[in-house]
Regions:
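Generic protein-terminus/edge-of-domain signal
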Residues: 1-59
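A hydrophobic/aromatic-rich effector-binding and dimerization subdomain
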Residues: 2-11, 75-138
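Amphipathic, well-ordered alpha-helical segments in soluble domains
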Residues: 38-41, 124-131, 151, 155-158
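Short beta-strand His + acidic residue motifs that chelate non-heme Fe in jelly-roll/DSBH
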Residues: 49-50, 72-77
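Histidine-centered metal-chelating micro-motifs
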Residues: 64, 68-74, 93
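All-alpha amphipathic helical-bundle segments outside canonical DNA-binding/catalytic cores
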Residues: 120, 137-151
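Hydrophobic recognition helices of helix-based DNA-binding modules
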Residues: 136, 159-163
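Conserved small/polar residues in nucleotide/adenosyl-binding loops
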Residues: 166-168
Length: 168
Protein backbone atom coordinates (compact mmCIF):
# COMPACT_ATOMS: atom_id res chain seq x y z
CA UNK A 1 0.00 0.00 0.00
CA UNK A 2 1.45 3.33 -1.06
CA UNK A 3 0.98 6.21 1.38
CA UNK A 4 0.65 9.68 -0.10
CA UNK A 5 1.54 12.59 2.16
CA UNK A 6 1.04 16.28 1.45
CA UNK A 7 4.21 17.75 -0.07
CA UNK A 8 5.69 20.77 1.73
CA UNK A 9 8.28 23.18 0.37
CA UNK A 10 9.42 26.64 1.41
CA UNK A 11 8.12 29.78 -0.33
CA UNK A 12 11.65 31.17 -0.76
CA UNK A 13 15.10 29.69 -1.46
CA UNK A 14 16.15 30.16 2.15
CA UNK A 15 14.15 30.87 5.26
CA UNK A 16 15.60 31.02 8.75
CA UNK A 17 14.00 31.95 12.06
CA UNK A 18 15.31 32.01 15.59
CA UNK A 19 12.02 31.83 17.49
CA UNK A 20 9.86 29.00 16.15
CA UNK A 21 7.16 28.22 18.69
CA UNK A 22 4.31 25.77 18.97
CA UNK A 23 2.08 28.16 17.00
CA UNK A 24 4.22 27.58 13.91
CA UNK A 25 4.89 23.90 14.63
CA UNK A 26 1.13 23.24 14.70
CA UNK A 27 1.20 23.60 10.91
CA UNK A 28 2.88 20.17 10.94
CA UNK A 29 0.26 18.41 13.10
CA UNK A 30 -0.65 16.40 10.01
CA UNK A 31 2.08 14.19 8.55
CA UNK A 32 3.71 15.68 5.48
CA UNK A 33 6.66 14.96 3.21
CA UNK A 34 9.27 17.70 3.00
CA UNK A 35 10.57 18.77 -0.36
CA UNK A 36 12.85 21.25 1.38
CA UNK A 37 15.94 20.63 3.50
CA UNK A 38 15.48 21.88 7.07
CA UNK A 39 17.99 21.91 9.91
CA UNK A 40 16.86 22.99 13.37
CA UNK A 41 18.06 23.16 16.95
CA UNK A 42 15.77 22.99 19.96
CA UNK A 43 16.51 26.04 22.11
CA UNK A 44 13.90 25.59 24.82
CA UNK A 45 11.53 22.96 26.16
CA UNK A 46 10.83 19.57 24.70
CA UNK A 47 8.45 18.06 22.20
CA UNK A 48 7.44 14.79 20.64
CA UNK A 49 7.64 14.43 16.90
CA UNK A 50 7.56 11.76 14.24
CA UNK A 51 10.33 11.71 11.63
CA UNK A 52 10.03 9.12 8.87
CA UNK A 53 7.27 7.48 10.91
CA UNK A 54 9.54 6.94 13.96
CA UNK A 55 8.86 8.78 17.23
CA UNK A 56 11.43 11.11 18.79
CA UNK A 57 11.51 13.28 21.87
CA UNK A 58 13.42 16.48 21.22
CA UNK A 59 15.22 18.44 23.97
CA UNK A 60 17.31 21.62 24.18
CA UNK A 61 20.46 21.55 22.02
CA UNK A 62 19.18 18.65 19.92
CA UNK A 63 20.10 19.02 16.25
CA UNK A 64 17.29 17.99 13.90
CA UNK A 65 18.23 17.32 10.27
CA UNK A 66 15.38 16.88 7.80
CA UNK A 67 16.52 16.07 4.29
CA UNK A 68 14.25 16.34 1.24
CA UNK A 69 11.81 13.43 1.24
CA UNK A 70 11.58 13.26 5.04
CA UNK A 71 8.12 12.62 6.49
CA UNK A 72 7.49 14.77 9.56
CA UNK A 73 4.72 15.30 12.08
CA UNK A 74 4.66 17.46 15.20
CA UNK A 75 2.95 15.39 17.86
CA UNK A 76 2.95 17.41 21.07
CA UNK A 77 4.98 19.64 23.29
CA UNK A 78 5.67 18.47 26.80
CA UNK A 79 6.50 22.02 27.87
CA UNK A 80 6.93 25.40 26.17
CA UNK A 81 9.06 24.72 23.12
CA UNK A 82 11.18 26.92 20.88
CA UNK A 83 13.42 26.10 17.91
CA UNK A 84 15.75 27.97 15.61
CA UNK A 85 16.09 26.70 12.07
CA UNK A 86 17.41 27.22 8.58
CA UNK A 87 15.42 25.84 5.69
CA UNK A 88 16.32 25.60 2.03
CA UNK A 89 13.80 25.10 -0.76
CA UNK A 90 13.67 21.99 -2.92
CA UNK A 91 14.92 24.12 -5.80
CA UNK A 92 17.99 25.18 -3.80
CA UNK A 93 18.66 21.69 -2.42
CA UNK A 94 18.36 20.31 -5.95
CA UNK A 95 21.16 22.55 -7.22
CA UNK A 96 23.79 21.19 -4.85
CA UNK A 97 25.14 17.68 -4.42
CA UNK A 98 23.66 16.72 -1.05
CA UNK A 99 25.60 13.46 -0.97
CA UNK A 100 28.92 15.21 -1.55
CA UNK A 101 28.32 17.48 1.43
CA UNK A 102 26.84 14.81 3.70
CA UNK A 103 29.17 12.04 2.54
CA UNK A 104 29.46 9.00 4.77
CA UNK A 105 27.21 10.66 7.38
CA UNK A 106 24.14 9.95 5.22
CA UNK A 107 23.29 6.59 6.86
CA UNK A 108 23.70 8.17 10.31
CA UNK A 109 21.37 11.03 9.36
CA UNK A 110 18.72 8.63 8.10
CA UNK A 111 19.10 6.38 11.14
CA UNK A 112 19.28 9.21 13.68
CA UNK A 113 17.91 12.57 12.43
CA UNK A 114 17.91 13.94 16.00
CA UNK A 115 21.34 14.28 17.63
CA UNK A 116 22.15 15.91 20.99
CA UNK A 117 24.88 18.54 20.81
CA UNK A 118 26.99 20.01 23.57
CA UNK A 119 26.25 23.64 24.47
CA UNK A 120 29.28 25.06 22.67
CA UNK A 121 28.68 23.33 19.33
CA UNK A 122 24.96 24.12 19.50
CA UNK A 123 25.78 27.80 20.09
CA UNK A 124 27.83 27.97 16.87
CA UNK A 125 24.93 26.67 14.79
CA UNK A 126 22.44 28.91 16.62
CA UNK A 127 24.62 31.91 15.77
CA UNK A 128 24.81 30.84 12.12
CA UNK A 129 21.03 30.38 11.98
CA UNK A 130 20.60 33.85 13.55
CA UNK A 131 22.79 35.35 10.83
CA UNK A 132 20.79 33.57 8.12
CA UNK A 133 17.58 34.74 9.81
CA UNK A 134 18.66 38.38 9.73
CA UNK A 135 19.63 38.08 6.07
CA UNK A 136 16.68 35.99 4.85
CA UNK A 137 14.05 38.09 6.65
CA UNK A 138 15.49 41.47 5.65
CA UNK A 139 13.35 43.05 2.94
CA UNK A 140 16.25 45.32 1.94
CA UNK A 141 18.67 42.46 1.35
CA UNK A 142 18.29 39.71 -1.21
CA UNK A 143 20.51 36.68 -0.77
CA UNK A 144 22.10 35.68 -4.05
CA UNK A 145 21.46 32.05 -5.09
CA UNK A 146 25.16 31.25 -4.87
CA UNK A 147 25.28 32.54 -1.29
CA UNK A 148 22.21 30.47 -0.39
CA UNK A 149 23.79 27.33 -1.87
CA UNK A 150 27.04 27.96 0.01
CA UNK A 151 25.08 28.42 3.24
CA UNK A 152 23.36 25.05 2.77
CA UNK A 153 26.67 23.40 1.90
CA UNK A 154 28.29 24.93 5.01
CA UNK A 155 25.54 23.60 7.27
CA UNK A 156 25.56 20.11 5.73
CA UNK A 157 29.35 19.90 5.88
CA UNK A 158 29.24 21.00 9.52
CA UNK A 159 26.70 18.27 10.28
CA UNK A 160 28.90 15.68 8.54
CA UNK A 161 31.88 16.76 10.64
CA UNK A 162 29.82 16.78 13.86
CA UNK A 163 28.49 13.29 13.15
CA UNK A 164 31.99 11.99 12.42
CA UNK A 165 32.90 12.88 16.02
CA UNK A 166 29.77 11.39 17.59
CA UNK A 167 29.27 7.67 17.98
CA UNK A 168 25.58 7.06 17.44
Amino acid sequence: MKMDFPQVDLPTEVLAWTNVTEDILNIYKQSCRLQACIVAICTEGSMKTSINLLDYEIHPNDLITLLPGTIIQFRERTEKVCLCFAGFSAHCAGRINLMKNIGNAYPKLIEQPVVPLNEEVASYLKDYFALLSRASCNENFEMDSELVELSLQTILTSIRLILSLIHI
